[in-house]
Structures are given as structure tokens and as C-alpha cells.
């Protein structure tokens, strides 16, 4: 029936609706505990923790890494609010049953501050994961960290934490991951760390840890990842590390380990990466390492290893990266190396490998991309089998002894992937630049420095046009006499070094038409000028904005500094030193004030004063050995990035620039040989490492506390990694240099070590006592106070200068004894105490017994075994000298009285007789030679 009622049509939908509603409500009931589990005391602790730190404001350029992805910093704690569920806060994970916080991830949260022992963090007793990576937290880790006994992961890397690892760390017995890298932790690794038996990952790299690695580290049987590089560990590598059978990654680079690699490392058959480079390891590499068949990376570079590379090294069949450069390996290069299929990088440069080269029988295309075997003792030619390395991108065979046979450059035409070729200092025949460039269609960098290169300006003999892909070309020391015209077509050229040649004439103007040229080194040639702007390719008509580094030192340039330089608006480094430029420094260089970081105009004939309104971005300014006059411009105070200021050997007439102490980055100050005068005011130079104000007219006394705030010379070792040499300079392209009096000689520092410290106040008119505060400069290497008027005693505090190598206090007015404490300065190789008023026992230290006698001469009464030893026949003990002198004086006094008596009586008789004659007779024979007329003549002559 149409329109009749069907009960099922209503029952079914109602039933379904009821079921859906029931399921939904049931789900809410079940899910409710996971959404509202925040415990009030946990929330309060987190909010208090939030207030313990400052939150920075990252800029758009700041970034950090999370899960190997680059992300922007994010202030995680800003989203924490009192009126919301803390288990839903960012960075918080709660236990689903108890509601307690078990994970706290505040990595990359821009937090500042330090932990206190009563931090609210330690109230989160059930915390399992704590990640504070990549913040700016500092201070020590309080021992209260040991209260978080449930921790399994503790990650504090990339902060500013310092001090020791707290001993309470051993309470974290459940810890599986401990990451403390890239902080300032110091001291030794506590041996109790060996009790953390669940540890699988230990990351302590890039800190200031020292001492020996505790052997207890071998107890961490679950460890798979151990990273300790870039610290100050020393001693031998503990053989107990060989017990870590599960270890897959072992990083020990950049420390001071000595001795051999433990043979027990051969037990680490799960090892994939072994890095022990940049230490002081020696001896043979244990043959047991050939057991590590899973090894993909073996890094042994920059040590003192000896012996040969085993022929069966191909047993390491998974090796992808083998680096053993800068050692003392001998023997031949095993051709079996080239039979390791996965091998991508091989670096054996700077060893003593010898013999002829054989690259083996390569049956299939090699995966090798980097073959670096230069600076050895190989002889012969380059094997033609090199062409089989079809994936090769970098090849370095510098210093190959080809026995004066030519190099077959056609080999390289088969290497379609070759990007970087280094063949410097071969003993080959002349290389014709015009002939070889056509072989390189894809090459971007070519180094043939130190070879005899012909660059005759002619058309290429090859039918192929020369490559136009080269971006970097090294032609230093090639005996070139004419600028290579073939470079004119190298439009991709960005880096060109033609230094140390014999190129004469003008620097060609077409150079400036190369649109990508950013580095040009013309130093040590015989150039006379830059091509005039009136020429066809003159400097006024070309684009020059790409030039960043220009070196033209030690040539024959004359006249004024060319004004075209002012148009190099991107210029970062300008070195025109050791030429014959005259006139003043161009004012147009003001156009470079925002880009120029390094300006070296040393050893020219420049005159006038230093400009007042340029160079505000400078990091290094050297105008020494010119004819500059006037005063130091006070505008220097605005050079906030200035690290080096050298104005030596000019005619600057000014008082001491105490106001330079406001330059917080100033490290080198040289005012030597000018006309500076007056007292030197007390000033704070927190980063100053080298100061030379010698040979001026400074006077007055030095305040007792003068050196108290010279912190860089006092505690340099705390701030610098002295295990690896670092030099002052702007990256790869420029390194500062200077001349300094050291050990009595003028020593040229071609590069300035960042840990080098020196103080030279010699050749002035200082008086008074040497300040006792000089003993605070514990990092000082050179101290020269000679040729002044210092008086009083040499301060015994100088005995604190434990790093001192050279001490000169000669030509002063010092009195008293040489402090016995100086005898304990084991590095003091040179000393000079001469020309003072010193007396007493000379210290008996070994270094004192190695000096020349002249170091002690012209004093009042120095004596002692040390002096007897260094002077030997030249020296008579002071006490004996005094006795001899007194006896001689007594004898001379007796003789004088006798002589006086002998002459006295006849003298009286003669005097009375002459007096009688003068009064009575005045004879003419007497008056002519001795009388009035002669007196008149003498008076006239005198006037």
C-alpha cells in the first residue's frame, strides 16, 4: 500500500545513531585521561624553569639543526601558559598513566642563563629525556643533575657550559646517551663514567677536556658511538677501548695522544669509522686493523706514523675514505689500494713514499674521486692508467720527480669529471701554458706553481680553443717574464696568482675586463705601473666591482697610489707594501670604508697624515716604514673591528693613545720608532697580545697596577686551543706579519700565531720601578724593557712568567739581586741583564748557564757558579775584584803621598825664588812669554 508505515525504517537509523553516540562518548571517556593528565606540581616546576632563563630574540639569519634539518630557532617556552595542560605544551612529553613529565626538549630554544643547584628542573624526578642542545646556557652543571636517576638521554651540546663533569653523573645508571659536545667543559673524564653500563652513545667533542682517557671507558660494553675529538687529551690511547665489541664509530682526532694505536683495536670488528688524525701518534699502524673489514673511513693524517702501507690493505674491502697525509710513511704506494671498489677518497700526501707509480690493473671503472698523493718522493712519469679513473674530480701529484721528462697532459683529456688538478713543483721540462690549456675542457682549478712555465704571447698551437672553464689558476714561482696573454679569454677566471715571477712592465688593463676576477696576486715581480686609463682597455672604462683581494707587494710601482683602486667597491684586502709609492693616502679611498678589512701600505714613501674619515671597517692597518707625520687620528676609536694597528718607523708626533683601549678586539699595537712622547696613561687592553712602543720618547713611571687588566696576556691559555696552530688573518687569503725584537735580534713574523705574546717598551725614558703586576702576564713570551732608566729591584713576580722565552732589561739602573725565581723559568732561552747596578748571586737555573757572558757584564757585583761557568776566563769574581781594587787603592794612596812629599819641598823653593824675581826685577825675558801681552792675546783668541 502506498504511504504505509514501515517500522524498520525508523528503528534502524535510531539504532545506528545510538551506537555512534555511544562509541563517541566511550571514546571521550577512554581518551580523557591522556588529555588532562598535567600534574599541578609538574606544571608549576616547568613555569618556574621558564622564568629561570632569559629568552633571546633570534634574527632572520639565525638557524640551528633538528633531526639533521636546518630550522630557525624557536623560543619553545613562550607557548607555556598557566591556564593550559602542560602535557600539551611544546617540548613536553608526559607519561600517559602517571601524568608526570618524562621528556623535556628545549633544543634550539634561544635560552640564556645558567643552572642553579636548586633549579626547578631537578623536581622533575621521573624525567627520562633532557635535551637542551643549541642554546646559550653557561656555568657549571650542578651536582643535582645526579638526582634525575631515571634519565636515559642527556643532551647538552652546543652551549657554553664549563667546569668539570660532576661526579654525580655516575648516579644516572640508566643513561644510554650522553652528549656534551661543543661546550667549555674542562678537566678529566671521571673514571666513574665506566659505571654507566647502559651507555650506547658518548659525545664529548670540542671542549677543553684534558688528561688521559680513563681505562674504565672500556667497561662500556654497550657503547656503539664514542666521540672525543678537539680536546686536550694526552697520553696513550687506552687499549681497553678494544673491549668495546659493539663500537661502530670512534672519533679521537685533534688531541695530543702519543704512542701507537693499540693493537686491540683489531678486535673492533663492527667499526665503520676510525678517526685518529691530528695527534702525535707514532710507530707502525698495527696490522690488526686489517681485521676491520666493515671499515668505511680510516683517518690517520697529521701524526708521526712510520713504516709502510701494507700491500694487502685491500682486505679493507668496504673502505671509502683513507687519509694518511702528513706522516712519515715510507715504501711504495700499494697498487692494491686501487682494487678497493668503494674507495672514493685517497690522501697520502706529505709522506716519504717513493718508487715509481703504478695504479694497478683496473678492470672496471673506478669510483675514486679524490686522489691526493703529492709531496712524496715518487719518481717517473704519470701513469697513463690514470685515465681509467673516469670519476676523478681532484688529482694532486705535486713534487713528483719526473727526472726532467715532459708531462703528457693529454692523459687528462680523458678525465671528463676532473675539476681540480695540482701539479706544482715537478722536476719536468718547461710547460707551455698555451699548449696545455686546450686539454682542460671542464677543469676549474689548475696549480702548476714552481714549474718553469712558458707563457709566450702567441696563438695556441692546438686547433682546439683554450678552455674557458678555469676559475682558479696558480702560476706562482714559474719564472714568467711577460704577462700571459692567453688569460685574456678566461672569462670564468676568479682566482689568479702570478706572484714570485719576473714579470716586468705594466699590469695589463684587460685584466679588469674579466668579470669574475675576485683574487689577484701580483706580489714579488718587477711591475712598474698599472696600465694607464688612456689605453684601449683602460681602467676607467671597465667594470671592476668583483675584485675582493688585491696583492701587489714588493714590486717597482712608483708615483702616487692609483686612484682607480677607489673604484674597486667590493675590495676587502689591499696590499701595496714594499713599493715606492709616494704622496699621501688618497682621500677617495673613503669609498671603500664599508668593505675594506685589510690595508697594508708598509714600506713605501708615503707622506702626510693618516686620513681621519676612512677605513672604519678595517681589521688590520699596517702603514709602517713610511714618512707619515702628525698625530694618530682619534677617529680610530670608531674602528670597532680593528685587531692590528702598525704605524712603526714613521714621524708621528703624539702622546700615548690610551683611548685605543676601548677597541675590544685590538690584539697587536706597534708604535715603534716614531716621536711619541710623554707618560703612558693607565689603560685596559683586554685582548692585546703584542705591544711594541719601543724607540720613542715616552717617559715617567709605570703605575704599580698597570698590567692588572691586560687579560689576554694573563690567561690566554684558557681561551685558546694551543694544540693546533692558528694564525691571525682574514681566512685563507691574508695573514698578518710584523718584525719584532726577540732574543736580541730583529725577527720577522711572516705569520702571527694567535697565542704569540710580546711586550717591548725598550728605547724610551721610563723610570721608577718595574711594576710588580708584570708578573700577572703569565702567557708572555717576549719581554723587552731595555734602554730605559728603570730603577729599584727586578720584581720577583717575574718568576710567574712561566712561558717567557726572551727577557731583556739591559741598559737601565736596576739594583739588588737577580731574583732567584727566574732560575725556574725553563723556557727562558735568552736574557740580558747587562749595564745595570745589579749585585749578588746569579740564579743557578739551567737557562742561566747557557747565556753569553755579555748578558751580565757592567754590573756592580754579580757572582756565583752560573756566572763563573758562562764567563770562565773572562770573569773575575766580584768579591775578588773588590779586594783587589781596595788593595790597589791603598797602594796608590801611599805612592801618592810619597810623590807629593818628593815634589813638595823643591816646589816651595822654586816658588819663593820666582816670586822674589817677579817682585824685585821683572826681567824682560820673563815678561815677554808670560806677561801682560801674552795674556791679552789669549783672551782675544778665547773670545
Swiss-Prot record:
It comes from the Eukaryota. Keywords: Cell membrane, Glycoprotein, Leucine-rich repeat, Membrane, Receptor, Repeat, Signal, Transmembrane, Transmembrane helix. It is a single-pass type I membrane protein. SMART domains: LRR_SD22, LRR_TYP. LRR repeats lie at residues 124-148, 150-171, 172-196, 198-220, 222-244, 245-267, 268-292, 293-317, 319-340, 341-364, 366-389, 390-414, 415-439, 440-463, 467-490, 491-514, 515-537, 544-568, 569-592, 593-617, 619-639, 640-665, 667-685, 686-709, 753-777, 778-801, 802-825, 827-850. The chain crosses the membrane at residues 898-918. Glycans are attached at residues 67, 82, 118, 147, 171, 195, 219, 222, 291, 312, 354, 361, 391, 457, 521, 524, 556, 582, 605, 653, 699, 784, 800, 832, 852, 882. Its main location: membrane. Belongs to the RLP family. This is Receptor-like protein 35. It comes from Arabidopsis thaliana. The gene is RLP35.
Amino acid at each position: 500500500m502506498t504511504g504505509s508505515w514501515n517500522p524498520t525504517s525508523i528503528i534502524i537509523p535510531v539504532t545506528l545513531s545510538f551506537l555512534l553516540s555511544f562509541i563517541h562518548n566511550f571514546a571521550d571517556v577512554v581518551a580523557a585521561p591522556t588529555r588532562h593528565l598535567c600534574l599541578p606540581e609538574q606544571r608549576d616546576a616547568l613555569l618556574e624553569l621558564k622564568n629561570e632563563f632569559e629568552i633571546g630574540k633570534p634574527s632572520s639569519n639565525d638557524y640551528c639543526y633538528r633531526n639533521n634539518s636546518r630550522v630557525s630557532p624557536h623560543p619553545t617556552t613562550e607557548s607555556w601558559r598557566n591556564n593550559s595542560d602542560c602535557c600539551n605544551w611544546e617540548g613536553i612529553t608526559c607519561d600517559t598513566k602517571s601524568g608526570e613529565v618524562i621528556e623535556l626538549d628545549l633544543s634550539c630554544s634561544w635560552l640564556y642563563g645558567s643552572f642553579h643547584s636548586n633549579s626547578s628542573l631537578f623536581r622533575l624526578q621521573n624525567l627520562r629525556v633532557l635535551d637542551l642542545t643549541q642554546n646559550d646556557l653557561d656555568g657549571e652543571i650542578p651536582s643535582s643533575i645526579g638526582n634525575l636517576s631515571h634519565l636515559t638521554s642527556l643532551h647538552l651540546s652546543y652551549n657554553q657550559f664549563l667546569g668539570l663533569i660532576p661526579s654525580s653523573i655516575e648516579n644516572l645508571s640508566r643513561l644510554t646517551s650522553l652528549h656534551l659536545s661543543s661546550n667549555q667543559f674542562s678537566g678529566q673524564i671521571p673514571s666513574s663514567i665506566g659505571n654507566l653500563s647502559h651507555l650506547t652513545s658518548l659525545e664529548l667533542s670540542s671542549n677543553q677536556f684534558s688528561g688521559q682517557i680513563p681505562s674504565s671507558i672500556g667497561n662500556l660494553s654497550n657503547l656503539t658511538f664514542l666521540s672525543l675529538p678537539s680536546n686536550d687529551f694526552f697520553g696513550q690511547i687506552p687499549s681497553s677501548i678494544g673491549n668495546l665489541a659493539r663500537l661502530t664509530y670512534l672519533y679521537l682526532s685533534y688531541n695530543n695522544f702519543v704512542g701507537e694505536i693499540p693493537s686491540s683495536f683489531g678486535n673492533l670488528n663492527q667499526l665503520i669509522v676510525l678517526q685518529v688524525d691530528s695527534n702525535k701518534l707514532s710507530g707502525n699502524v698495527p696490522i690488526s686493523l686489517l681485521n676491520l673489514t666493515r671499515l668505511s673511513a680510516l683517518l690517520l693524517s697529521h701524526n708521526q706514523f712510520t713504516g709502510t702501507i701494507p700491500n694487502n690493505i685491500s682486505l679493507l674491502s668496504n673502505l671509502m675514505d683513507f687519509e694518511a697525509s702528513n706522516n712519515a710513511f715510507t715504501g711504495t704506494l700499494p697498487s692494491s689500494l686501487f682494487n678497493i671498489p668503494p674507495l672514493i677518497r685517497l690522501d697520502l700526501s706529505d709522506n716519504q713514499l717513493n718508487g715509481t707509480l703504478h695504479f694497478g690493473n683496473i678492470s672496471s671503472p673506478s669510483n675514486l674521486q679524490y686522489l691526493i698523493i703529492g709531496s712524496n718522493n715518487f719518481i717517473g712519469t704519470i701513469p697513463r692508467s690514470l685515465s681509467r679513473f673516469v670519476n676523478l674530480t681532484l688529482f694532486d701529484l705535486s713534487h713528483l720527480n719526473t727526472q726532467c721528462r715532459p708531462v703528457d697532459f693529454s692523459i687528462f683529456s680523458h678525465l671528463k669529471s676532473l675539476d681540480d688538478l695540482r701539479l706544482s713543483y715537478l722536476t719536468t721540462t718547461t710547460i707551455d701554458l698555451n699548449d696545455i690549456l686546450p686539454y682542460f675542457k671542464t677543469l676549474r682549478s689548475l696549480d702548476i706553481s714552481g714549474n718553469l712555465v712558458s707563457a709566450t704571447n702567441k696563438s695556441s698551437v692546438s686547433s682546439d680553443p683554450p678552455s674557458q672553464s678555469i676559475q682558479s689558476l696558480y702560476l706562482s714561482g714559474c719564472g714568467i717574464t711577460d704577462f700571459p696573454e692567453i688569460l685574456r679569454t678566461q672569462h670564468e677566471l676568479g682566482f689568479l696568482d702570478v706572484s714570485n715571477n719576473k714579470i716586468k712592465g705594466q699590469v695589463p688593463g684587460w685584466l679588469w675586463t674579466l668579470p669574475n676576477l675576485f683574487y689577484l696576486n701580483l706580489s714579488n715581480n718587477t711591475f712598474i705601473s698599472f696600465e694607464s686609463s688612456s689605453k684601449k682597455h683602460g681602467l676607467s672604462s671597465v667594470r671592476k666591482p668583483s675584485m675582493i683581494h688585491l696583492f701587489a707587494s714588493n714590486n717597482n710601482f712608483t708615483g702616487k697610489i692609483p686612484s682607480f683602486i677607489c673604484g674597486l667597491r667590493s675590495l676587502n684586502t689591499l696590499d701595496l707594501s714594499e713599493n715606492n709609492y709616494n704622496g699621501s693616502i688618497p682621500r677617495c679611498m673613503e669609498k671603500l670604508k664599508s668593505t675594506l678589512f685589510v690595508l697594508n701600505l708598509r714600506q713605501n714613501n708615503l707622506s702626510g697624515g693618516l686620513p681621519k674619515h676612512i677605513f672604519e671597517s678595517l681589521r688590520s692597518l699596517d702603514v709602517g716604514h713610511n714618512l707619515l707625520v702628525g698625530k694618530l687620528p682619534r677617529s680610530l676609536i670608531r674602528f670597532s673591528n680593528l685587531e692590528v694597528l702598525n704605524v712603526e718607523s714613521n714621524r708621528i708626533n703624539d702622546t700615548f693613545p690610551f683611548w685605543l683601549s676601548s677597541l675590544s678586539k685590538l690584539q697587536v699595537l706597534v708604535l715603534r720608532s716614531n716621536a711619541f712622547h710623554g707618560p703612558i696613561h693607565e689603560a685596559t687592553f683586554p685582548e692585546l697580545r703584542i705591544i711594541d712602543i719601543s724607540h720613542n720618547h715616552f717617559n715617567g713611571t709605570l703605575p704599580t697596577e698597570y698590567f692588572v687588566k691586560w687579560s689576554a696576556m694573563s690567561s690566554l691559555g684558557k681561551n685558546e686551543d694551543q694544540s693546533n696552530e692558528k694564525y691571525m688573518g682574514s681566512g685563507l687569503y691574508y695573514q698578518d706579519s710584523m718584525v719584532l725584537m726577540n732574543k736580541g735580534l730583529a725577527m720577522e713574523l711572516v705569520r702571527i700565531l694567535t697565542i704569540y705574546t710580546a711586550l717591548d717598551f725598550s728605547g724610551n725614558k721610563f723610570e721608577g720601578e718595574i711594576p710588580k703586576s708584570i708578573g700577572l702576564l703569565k702567557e708572555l713570551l717576549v719581554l723587552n724593557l731595555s734602554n730605559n732608566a728603570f730603577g729599584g729591584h727586578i720584581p720577583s713576580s717575574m718568576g710567574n712568567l712561566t712561558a717567557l722565552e726572551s727577557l731583556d732589561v739591559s741598559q737601565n739602573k736596576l739594583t739588588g739581586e737577580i731574583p732567584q725565581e727566574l732560575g725556574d723559568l725553563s723556557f727562558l732561552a735568552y736574557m740580558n741583564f747587562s749595564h745595570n747596578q745589579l749585585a749578588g748571586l746569579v740564579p743557578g737555573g739551567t737557562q742561566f748557564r747557557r747565556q753569553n757572558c755579555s748578558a751580565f757584564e757592567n754590573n756592580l757585583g754579580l757572582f756565583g757558579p752560573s756566572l763563573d761557568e758562562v764567563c770562565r776566563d773572562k770573569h773575575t769574581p766580584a768579591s775578588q775584584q773588590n779586594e783587589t781594587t781596595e788593595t790597589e787603592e791603598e797602594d796608590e794612596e801611599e805612592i801618592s803621598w810619597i810623590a807629593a812629599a818628593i815634589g813638595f819641598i823643591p816646589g816651595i823653593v822654586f816658588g819663593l825664588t820666582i816670586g822674589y824675581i817677579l817682585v824685585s826685577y821683572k826681567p824682560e825675558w820673563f815678561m815677554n812669554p808670560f806677561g801682560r801681552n801674552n795674556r791679552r792675546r789669549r783672551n782675544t783668541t778665547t773670545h
